Amino acid sequence: MPHSPLISIPHVWCHPEEEERMHDELLQAVSKGPVMFRDVSIDFSQEEWECLDADQMNLYKEVMLENFSNLVSVGLSNSKPAVISLLEQGKEPWMVDRELTRGLCSDLESMCETKILSLKKRHFSQVIITREDMSTFIQPTFLIPPQKTMSEEKPWECKICGKTFNQNSQFIQHQRIHFGEKHYESKEYGKSFSRGSLVTRHQRIHTGKKPYECKECGKAFSCSSYFSQHQRIHTGEKPYECKECGKAFKYCSNLNDHQRIHTGEKPYECKVCGKAFTKSSQLFLHLRIHTGEKPYECKECGKAFTQHSRLIQHQRMHTGEKPYECKQCGKAFNSASTLTNHHRIHAGEKLYECEECRKAFIQSSELIQHQRIHTDEKPYECNECGKAFNKGSNLTRHQRIHTGEKPYDCKECGKAFGSRSDLIRHEGIHTG
């Protein structure tokens, strides 16, 4: 009677002899703990998953669902893992681990291109482990390194992503990224990690220790990878180049975001209104429109903003700071966008043209205001008397009639006015 299969493990394509060898090695890898679902599951990041073809994706889904079903049938799994729930709903498996992947981004940057190229070239097959063979204890075959040969420069190759290593210890350490193994524990804080170096790095969060200091600007960092990334600001190094247009970037994540301009891909969709974005950060900010959340509040006047950058820009109104200076005329501005618009004055550039009368404007906001002349639209209405205006500034000026506010004082005689134009007219009396 043939053995009944219990666990199917997807792995990179190999010859029958190699498959048989891996099967034997797998049986020798029996450990002292019961089989858990994580022992026979494989995680993919979004980038890795998108490199698989339809057949490979289907095989992965079938094997994962079969493995879980078999574990349940012999009483080895009581709760349903999140990845199984996603697969049963027809969703992508990498969604369950997005936050983990994001957290490892700095460590995996150098692996990004190697993984993608390797996964595009490789195919999956299955190793079948029977109930009788396995007893009740196994470990994934991916943890079994290949035999080292003297002729190979980097003999230790990861069968999941194709990355190669000079040393067995590096290879084993790398495998824990795929399998989520965490052998190193920070006893003081009760958190586990896949590498000893990550324990040290985590402890620095609590101690505040930042041993990596930039000699250029003095800024300090808790881990070497963040320090290396920071140094690119000073060196101008941009190692990640777009093969489509040649534009280069400091970080792998920035290249990935940029490439979506060429592909038109917008994977982050708002479930409220359906609007899609190329970056998760853009979606995160967009959601605040629906929730009304404005977490960044000005301590000076209480005005709140959806973005931190908007708060910083606003605060310059109180401080009078204008860090963006025009090199052509010396005029300074409180925001980069205002300086960009100002540059168009020198260039004579007017990008925004009215289709009704062909009048052109430097800024889009000026065009929008101008178009209200043609449409007679007056969106700014006074709550006090109902009078409407085509500009927000006109409404503000009008409301001072009701409030009696006169913020513009004459320095010569102290008389106050409700609008700047009235003050300028008055000052003409003193100058003659």
Swiss-Prot record:
Sequence ranges assigned to domain KRAB in this UniProt record: 35-106
Record GO terms (molecular function): DNA-binding transcription factor activity, RNA polymerase II-specific; RNA polymerase II cis-regulatory region sequence-specific DNA binding; zinc ion binding
GO biological process: regulation of transcription by RNA polymerase II
Keywords: DNA-binding, Metal-binding, Nucleus, Repeat, Transcription, Transcription regulation, Zinc, Zinc-finger
Chief place where the protein resides: nucleus
Top-level taxon of origin: Eukaryota
Zn finger (C2H2-type) location: 156-178, 184-206, 212-234, 240-262, 268-290, 296-318, 324-346, 352-374, 380-402, 408-430
GO CC, any one term: nucleus
Cellular location(s): Nucleus
Zinc-finger among keywords: yes
SUPFAM superfamilies registered for this protein in UniProt: beta-beta-alpha zinc fingers, KRAB domain (Kruppel-associated box)
UniProt function note: May be involved in transcriptional regulation.
Family: Belongs to the krueppel C2H2-type zinc-finger protein family.
Name by which UniProt lists this protein: Zinc finger protein 829
UniProt gene name: ZNF829
